[in-house]
Amino acid sequence: MTLAAGLVLSVMSANAQQMREGYVEAGKNTGSENFHTLIQGWTPGSQITADDNFYISRVKPRARFRNEATQVRLDLNAKNDKKLIAWIPVNNPDFNALPNGVFDSEVFSMWSYVTHWGDWTAPLGRIPAAFLDIAHKNGVGVSGVASIPNASLSASWSACLKGIGSMDVDKASKFFQYYGIDGMGYNSEFYNGNSVVKPVRTFHAALVKKMKPVNPVFENFWYDGTNDFGQVTFDGGLGNHNKETFGDSENVRTSLFFNYNWNRGQLTPSVAYAEKLGRDPLDLYCGVNMQGGEPGGTSWSLLPDQRVSIGLWGAHSYNMFWESRAELGSSDEMKQFAYLRRTECYFGGGNRNPVITPSIVDKHQYTAYNPTWHGMAAFMTARSPLSWDLAEEPFITYFNLGNGKFFNLNGERKTSTPWYNVGMQDYMPTWHFWFANKLLGRTAADVPAEGLDAQFVWDDAYFGGSTLKVFGTTANEYLHLFKTKYALKKGDVITVRYKLNEGATDLDLVLSAEGSEDKGVAYNLCKSERVADVNDWVKQTFTVGSDFDGKTLALVALNFKNAKNLDLMLGEFSIVRGNYATPATPVIDAANTKMLYNSKAGMDAKIIFNMPNTKAAGEPCYNLDVKTSHFRLYAQEEGKEPMLMGTTTSWAGLYYSIPTTKANAKVRLGVSAVALDHKTESEIAWSNYMEPATYVYNDDIQSNKKTIKPNEEFTLSYIDPEHPAAKWEIVKDGEVVKSGEGNSWTTSLADVGSYDLKVTGNEYGEDGAAKQTTRTFASYIQITGEGTGALPEIYSLTANGSKEEVSLKTGESVKMAYTGRHADGAGSQGLDLKEKRFGVAASDLGLVGKKSYSISFWLKLNGIKSGDPTTLFNVYNKQDGWPK
């Protein structure tokens, strides 16, 4: 194939505020290779850096429960329900899961199919608290990784492993408890390490004994390369060569992550050997190389009959769900949409409904649309942690993913800047998405061929920046939301909040109790007569009476009947018992609360704080211990009103793009603690007003018009109104035809043609240092004749002869009038498809069989994000192998 493209480069760079070097200090020598010295130098209650609160989890790992009556697959039980470790990176390696001002950041939501996450780009002792918090909220353990190279053990790694082998296990266990880290992971494929592996094994056994009683999700992982003798033995299964590394019932040491060439000949004896050792064979994880498409052959179909688990790897810097998220388009929202689709298909099955599980195929897939992919739901149940005592903490979810292009609170817009904090993700539906035409319908025949669908959207939110939308047409369909184990009592208040944007439906909330899971009790939420209103978040509350008093809630579902062209957003589901106390006011660490960055986009800042508590130094203190659900972050420009800028679960926060009226404004930062029922908040603790950081100018320029006619005025300017003045020169055939000075300059040109633009002035680096430069932008200005068309301009607009606002009653008409520019002519204009796919059938173009073809197009790049993978054009054969 031939690809021809004309490239027109703009001079606008990406201006979104994002984390920069120095915002959060992890500390020197905190990599895995120095883990032993990190522990040696730490004492309970001490800090590694002043930014420790960005790395301390404030959510205790939840315990998960089993109830086979609310499973999709009834043949899975505690003995054969596989576990899964995602031994993969999180987000982009530069900032991992630290809070950021970048909307297009990773918000993993399929927690119910993951039992442990090995954060491949985080060291053993330094994992962002936001990621720890959301994983713990879902009952998932998290560990860092020691990436020991596939080579003879180096001196530095040998020193590290020797240090681990001789480490004080009491001190190490206190470290893991305090920071909330749930294990140790080793990419162990080194050799000549016979002198270090035995002490490390001894340490692992002692550590597990210390941690398991206080943290049931604690688990160490060992890549099954390096054996008991410090040499490499790949693809040997569990046997005499690695039994000591694995451990027995008395000394559980690690779980093994098998290399990718496992087969029936290895798995069957490995399961038997694990049982002989008194270990659960589910602690053996069959490795899946997501980058290379392994395992190959017929391996996937071996798994249902083997009592082993699944381990995902791939790759070193980005996980494969995230790396290729531009599959459906390059806009941030389309990449987010594709990422969610890829994960929903991969884990829940290619039809995004675990009831429709295709036959197991022996070909690895993780694309956004892959209806033949069996998904992880073919091997495991969707697990749930929703089982705690409602007297201690309510259950509340707003279906917020943890990122957004804006931030809403109670349905009201608070900021319009992008944000990311995955620690603030709400409880997600247990299944994505279990639709069926009857309650607990478990077969594909129970799913309407043309029924409802659900997806997360970033157009609106009751809380945060996203919500769950249900849409489509159906006669009768259930959406199973949550698998629960809550002991309800009379007086508990259940709230459902939704917004009916379009269409109509009869809608019921359906609840069922343990022992009668298939017998739902319905509570009406909406009648089909309700008029859609895009501005109305409808709140419905139900008080538990004799119907559920003393019963255990097992299932929460929605029943849609007579739905037609439905577009409905879910804003809240909650179960609250009684009233909860307002938390104490946070105490700000003034010395480490500071302004970080200042630019046209606003100001970035950091706040560190602590909560009053009675815990001993070095003892973990969770938000639940201080009667807090999360924290609200405020900013206030001197002389202006306070603004809510975001929320966090950590005892630290980052602010991005705080809006100010002037570049040298003083700003103070505030934080409040929100009660467990989200109904009250503490007083806001405020810092002093602080001087802004050094202003960093934006050197990008712009023209206020794209289509310009002879003698028509246009304005050239810096996009940054604070930028110092420059000299502007318009050049034609090497000669300056017009020039001017200023931050902006308005001029006109009489002759049709293409003109270069030269800008002479200060150009600024990230450090604020100025350098005098002359930049030339080739063919930046194009003057076109009247015959090629012009964009219309409206100079004045009236309604019923008035420029004032008018009010109309139903049936009344209004007379609109305008004065404007004559815009006749023929012109070519680009069409913005908003990342929607546009195409025609190849056969309609005569492209049949193996006929060759060419593709050509003009391409205008408005900007490419630095370090972000960008796809220009992609043609692929679905039968191709990987990597392509």
Question: Which positions does each model-derived feature cover?
Answer:
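Conserved aromatic anchor
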Residues: 602-625, 718
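Extracellular glycan-recognition modules
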Residues: 787-794, 835-884
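Extracellular/lumenal carbohydrate-interaction signature centered on repeated Trp-anchored short motifs
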Residues: 478-494, 532-533, 549, 662-663, ...
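Beta-strand-rich modules
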Residues: 656-682, 755-764
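Extracytoplasmic low-complexity segments
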Residues: 17-25, 29, 37, 80, ...
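Short hydrophobic/aromatic patches on beta-strands that form ligand-binding or substrate-lining surfaces
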Residues: 117, 496-498, 795-801, 855-861
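Chitinase-like catalytic core of GlcNAc-active glycosidases
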Residues: 76-269
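Extracellular fibronectin type III
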Residues: 677-694, 767-781
